[in-house]
């Protein structure tokens, strides 16, 4: 049984708030919709310079850290099939082909997290990780958007570690939820 975005928001919001408080960076939850990802929950950083929630409600998955985390859960064949018409054009051209995307997703799978280096928006970087359902499939992505001025290698590592831990907590919460919390 699939969980609705509303149910996912209710189940995952406490951990989303906890990781936002820990990092004081903007954090978001994403779902895959075809070749796009959609933001269905987020909490903004309280810093003066911060990434805004819903800056992109829907974006090509290969352009966001959360989207790449979701794409990395698929096989290369699935990625090829879903992008049979090619990659949607976007104003940043860091990844320009399916072959380049597959190479990038290989790195994401190795590291356990995805990055976005100003690929969705100039001045914005991010880290994204997969959140797994009780059956082990990837359900949603958890990401943090960070102004590029704060996105040092050390900060990227710190954010990745916090998101990986939070995603594990979220997965455990999903595995332990009461069946009555499932929508439809």
Where do the model's predicted regions map?
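Sparse recognition of residues in long alpha-helices and their boundaries
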Residues: 56, 151-152, 179
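Extended hydrophobic
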Residues: 94-167, 184
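Amphipathic alpha-helical effector-binding/dimerization core
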Residues: 1-85
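Cysteine/selenocysteine-centered motifs that mediate thiol-based redox chemistry or coordinate metal-sulfur cofactors
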Residues: 81-83, 164-184
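Conserved acidic, metal-coordinating active-site core of Asp-based
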Residues: 90
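Amphipathic alpha-helical regulatory segments at dimerization interfaces
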Residues: 11-22, 104-107, 111, 169-173
């Amino acid at each position: 049984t699939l969980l609705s975005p509303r149910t996912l928001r209710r189940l995952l919001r406490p951990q989303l708030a906890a990781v936002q408080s820990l990092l004081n960076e903007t954090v978001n939850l994403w779902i895959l919709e075809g070749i796009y990802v959609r933001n269905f929950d987020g909490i903004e950083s309280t810093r003066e310079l911060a990434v805004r929630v819903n800056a992109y409600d829907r974006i090509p998955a290969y352009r966001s850290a959360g989207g790449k985390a979701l794409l990395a859960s698929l096989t290369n064949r699935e990625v090829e099939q879903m992008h049979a018409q090619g990659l949607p054009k976007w104003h940043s051209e860091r990844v320009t082909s399916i072959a380049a995307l597959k190479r990038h997703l290989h790195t994401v799978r190795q590291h356990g997290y995805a990055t976005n280096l100003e690929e969705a928006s100039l001045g914005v970087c991010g880290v994204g990780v997969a959140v797994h359902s009780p059956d082990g499939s990837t359900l949603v992505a958890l990401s943090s958007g960070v102004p590029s001025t704060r996105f040092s290698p050390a900060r990227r590592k710190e954010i990745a570690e916090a998101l990986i831990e939070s995603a594990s907590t979220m997965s455990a919460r999903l595995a332990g939820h009461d069946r009555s919390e499932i929508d439809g």
